């Protein structure tokens, strides 16, 4: 699992389908 910070860019990069 990836331990990335809770940033808006990270969420969009990890789950772009959510924004689609």
UniProtKB/Swiss-Prot annotation:
Annotated family: Belongs to the iron/manganese superoxide dismutase family.
Annotated localization: Periplasm
EC number, as in UniProt: 1.15.1.1
Its biological purpose: Destroys superoxide anion radicals which are normally produced within the cells and which are toxic to biological systems.
Pfam families to which the protein is assigned, alphabetical: Sod_Fe_N
Assembly and interaction partners: Homodimer.
Entry keyword set: Iron, Metal-binding, Oxidoreductase, Periplasm
Cofactor notes: Binds 1 Fe cation per subunit.
Listed name of the protein: Superoxide dismutase [Fe]
GO molecular function: metal ion binding; superoxide dismutase activity
Originating organism: Photobacterium damsela subsp. piscicida
